[in-house]
């Protein structure tokens, strides 16, 4: 659906508590041309308590980031409620309905995908992978989560490297954020 990026979020339960990490590559393409290799597609929101990443049209994603952060502020950082309220707006607002982007969002309690159709999805295994390299990153993250003791951040790093080796729209310049 979206070319030009891979976003991956992993949550891991450890004896010390829940680890949550999100990462993305930095490649931006315009058709078949790489126009930027160091874009920052993941960030912390709501006073550093929520992680978010986007795949899709950049301007559309920034619009969603702004609206999602406003919902987080309005609902005191409650991730699920903010996501649902954003998707309600998404489905009823004529401008939002035309936005071509997906968001991956996570806090200490939940990880969610907010789709371009206005859906909110919570993955069962705590792994979110979106964008053109998402399937590669998802498979790598599942294997690493199930068969290693790597931290969530290290799983994100390794899985993004694997996706970057396989997906022509994903590069090796990664930004990784953790909670």
Swiss-Prot record:
| Signal sequence, start to end | none
Cross-referenced PANTHER family, in alphabetical order?
ATP-DEPENDENT PROTEASE SUBUNIT HSLV, METALLOPROTEASE TLDD
Tell me the name of the encoding gene.
hslV
Q: Which terms under GO biological process does the entry name?
A: proteolysis involved in protein catabolic process
Compartments where found: Cytoplasm
CDD domains named among the record's database cross-references: protease_HslV (cd01913)
Regulation acting on activity, per entry: Allosterically activated by HslU binding.
GO terms for molecular function, please?
Answer: metal ion binding; threonine-type endopeptidase activity
Disulfide bridge positions per record: none
What cellular component GO annotations does this protein have?
Answer: HslUV protease complex; proteasome core complex
Q: Please identify the protein, giving its name as recorded.
A: ATP-dependent protease subunit HslV
Major enzyme class: hydrolase
Q: Which residues form the active site?
A: 5
Do you know which InterPro entries this protein is assigned to? ATP-dep_Prtase_HsIV_su, Ntn_hydrolases_N, Proteasome_sua/b, Proteasome_suB-type
| Family the UniProt entry places it in | Belongs to the peptidase T1B family. HslV subfamily.
Description of how the protein assembles with itself and partners:
A double ring-shaped homohexamer of HslV is capped on each side by a ring-shaped HslU homohexamer. The assembly of the HslU/HslV complex is dependent on binding of ATP.
Q: What is its main location?
A: cytoplasm
Q: Which residues bind Na(+)?
A: 164, 167, 170
Q: Which UniProt keyword terms apply here? A: Allosteric enzyme, Cytoplasm, Hydrolase, Metal-binding, Protease, Sodium, Threonine protease
